[in-house]
Amino acid sequence: MALLAIMGRPNVGKSTLFNRITKSRKAMVDDSPGVTRDRNYADAEHDGVKFSVVDTGGFSKNDPDAFVDLIHFQVNQAIEEADAIAMVFDGKDGPSPFDRDLLSVLRPLDKPIFYLVNKIDSLDMEYLMADFAELGVDKLHPVSGEHGYGVPTFLDMVVKVLPKASPKLEEDMISIGVVGRPNAGKSSLINKILGQERLLVSDTPGTTRDAVDTVCQVNGKPYLLLDTAGIRRKGKVKHKLEKFSIVRALKGLERCDVALVMLDATEGITDQDVHIAGYAEERKCGCIFLANKWDLVKDKDWALKKIKDEVRMNAKFLNYAPFMTISALTGQRVNRIFELVDKVYAQYTTRISTSKLNRMLENAITRHEPPYHKGRRLKFYYATQVSTKPPTIVCFVNHPDAVHFSYKRFLINHIREETGLDQTPIRLLFRQRDRKDLKVLKSGG
């Protein structure tokens, strides 16, 4: 798919424009300069033409932010990848030395470049564009990322110059969320997979503030990778941008099929890791525990047993989640992650026939009779699978609210034993049904 890159100094409104074009809230928007540290990708469509948009970090040579060199590296990569570029100016602030710096980088490029004066909310404000004439660019376009003024006209021009879209990747690709506390190695892992520094990597926790979607192909198969900001415990989140990032990270979990829950093997599993694993379990996505930084572990046999025991004890609610050790730095076992992802996804999308389900349920009831409710035994009528991702099964019962969690756990474990679905969450729901209309499943006794 063709790519439009949005460039500009910090706080000129690139993220607001990005959200307007992509009709999303994907890029973080805030008044603080340098909010978009990383490149943020999303798809857009205008006049029937589909294309991708990248929102880059603010470009500023004298920015005191410690990540400025990394941001410049990211901007340069985005420039290389882009089929067209939109350079954004702040219509209310007028031209700045930073704008001239970026112009000096863009002018020599043999690519379509659109110069946008942002924050022009109406025709009456277009007089503000006169200040930018001194920059000597070919044509200035008034836009308002916040209100939409001028954006359709700009997009009309963009779709005319973009190359035709290449054959579309299959839509049903596996969506993978990479989650973990700050500095667990999430971005390093994705960079190792992609073979380039798509995401900012630094020793400072919280480097990746936003979530970035990236498509990669492994053995000819497409996967959608979602890297999220590190999730801190609520009490330790002070900066409002960090809070916004955490909300976005949790929303990313809602749309991923498989979550890679990254742990720091040199530290073992922490309370924070357990909280993050809990978020993944609540959203019922497939999960894989990755103990990263394995190259730094000395006594590997002892450490492996210790961390596996810790995971199984402290995150027992994810007892179905596979566990493996990796090194994002050296690439150790990184390729094997996708083999495991495929296995988890296959179970995550499994369908069980109604007849097989009811045989299993009948066997379970025979093996362990349902408990009593107000002096009468619970009656199970029948079960059916209503959806996948994860396998979701509805059991019709005379008193659904009376099914104890321990009996529910027994039924789920029985389904796992009979189907081999030992690496996916299973959602089991209970619904009311009139017993006179349905045959009651037999129980022993």
Swiss-Prot record:
GTP 1 binds at residues 8-15, 55-59, 118-121. Residues 350-434 form the KH-like domain. It comes from the Bacteria. CDD domains: EngA1, EngA2. One of its GO terms (molecular function) is ribosome binding. It holds the Pfam family MMR_HSR1. GTP 2 binds at residues 180-187, 227-231, 292-295. InterPro entries: G_ENGA (IPR031166), GTP-bd (IPR006073), GTPase_Der (IPR016484), KH_dom-like (IPR032859), KH_dom-like_a/b (IPR015946), P-loop_NTPase (IPR027417), Small_GTP-bd (IPR005225). Residues 2-166, 174-349 form the EngA-type G domain. The keyword GTP-binding applies. GO terms for biological process: ribosome biogenesis. Keywords: GTP-binding, Nucleotide-binding, Repeat, Ribosome biogenesis. HAMAP family: GTPase_Der (MF_00195). Belongs to the TRAFAC class TrmE-Era-EngA-EngB-Septin-like GTPase superfamily. EngA (Der) GTPase family. Associates with the 50S ribosomal subunit. GTPase that plays an essential role in the late steps of ribosome biogenesis. This is GTPase Der.
